[in-house]
């Protein structure tokens, strides 16, 4: 083996080992600091105590984070996938493609705190939605839209062209081909990208602080109510100082575990969908 190829191989192994070690150390350290706090009561009770969050649990924050994330996924994934379909299978004008791609790139570069400020000024105040899950979810949806669109567009480009051409050759319309051939074939990768985008939204603090997350709230019953969120709760615990540090580490571990579990489920689902499609 040439020395350059050998060096590249060793560098790849070293990088993989370093990244794995950092992730394991991060999870291990956070779990070690918060292990005494994590319990069934911590996961299922509401926060309490003279200093809010010092006692009790984080159940409303868990439910709130899931509500924020799920709503953002619905609002962000539909236009993202529609844009990707248009870019790959409908749009033939290079200038329009370049314009759309530039807009998507510009959106991806907007800081999350700016999106939060926009949602606060336009949705919370001008449209009088108030601080609620829907206001935050719109900001989060805008934030994750470029991520999902780019991943979906890449997935559509990797689809074997003969699959689409065969459908057209049989006289199938473009809409029929998209709905019955393309989307089922790419379902696994699309769902995986959507879930990963949701994980990105779950950890975003700035948009939630401005628009819908509050220090304390019960489990929300509608999208027009404010809610607790794990990033916001963690921020408040850290701001309170050393008395709440154990609870803060417990909250951080739960949030990291939810994100890791979502990533694993997305990966497993994508692989199983690919196998089923190849078999069929």
Model regions and ranges:
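C-terminal transmembrane helix and the adjacent membrane-cytosol boundary/short C-terminal tail
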Residues: 153-157, 168, 195, 235-280
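Glycine/proline-centered hinge or cleavage motifs at structural transition points of membrane proteins
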Residues: 111, 170-171, 184
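Interhelical loop and adjacent transmembrane-helix boundary motif
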Residues: 50, 208-256
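Generic hydrophobic transmembrane alpha-helix motif, especially the helices
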Residues: 105-141
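Transmembrane-helix boundary motif in ABC transporter permease subunits
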Residues: 72-104, 117, 267-275
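Periplasmic/extracellular loop-to-transmembrane helix junction in inner-membrane transport proteins
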Residues: 1-11, 30-74, 236-246
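Transmembrane alpha-helices
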Residues: 151, 174-212
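Transmembrane alpha-helical segments of polytopic membrane transport and secretion proteins
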Residues: 1-18, 266-280
């Amino acid at each position: 083996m040439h020395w350059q190829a050998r060096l590249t191989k060793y560098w790849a192994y070293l990088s993989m080992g370093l990244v794995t070690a950092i992730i394991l150390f991060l999870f291990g350290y956070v779990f070690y600091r918060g292990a005494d706090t994590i319990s069934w009561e911590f996961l299922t009770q509401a926060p309490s105590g003279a200093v809010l969050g010092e006692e009790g649990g984080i159940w409303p924050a868990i439910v709130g984070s899931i509500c924020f994330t799920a709503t953002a996924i619905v609002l962000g994934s539909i236009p993202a996938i529609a844009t990707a379909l248009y870019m790959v299978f409908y749009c033939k004008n290079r200038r329009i493609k370049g314009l759309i791609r530039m807009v998507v790139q510009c959106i991806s570069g907007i800081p999350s705190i700016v999106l939060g400020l926009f949602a606060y000024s336009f949705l919370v105040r001008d449209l009088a939605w108030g601080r609620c899950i829907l206001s935050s979810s719109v900001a989060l949806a805008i934030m994750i839209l470029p991520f999902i669109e780019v991943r979906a567009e890449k997935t559509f480009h990797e689809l074997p062209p003969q699959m689409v051409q065969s459908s057209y050759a049989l006289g199938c319309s473009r809409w029929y081909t998209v709905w019955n051939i393309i989307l089922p074939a790419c379902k696994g990768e699309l769902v995986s990208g959507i879930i990963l985008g949701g994980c990105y939204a779950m950890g975003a603090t700035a948009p939630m602080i401005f628009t819908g997350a509050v220090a304390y709230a019960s489990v929300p019953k509608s999208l027009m109510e404010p809610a607790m969120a794990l990033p916001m709760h963690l921020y408040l615990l850290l701001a309170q100082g050393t008395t709440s540090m154990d609870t803060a580490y417990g909250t951080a571990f739960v949030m990291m575990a939810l994100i890791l579990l979502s990533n694993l489920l997305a990966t497993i689902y994508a692989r199983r969908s690919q196998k089923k499609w190849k078999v069929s």
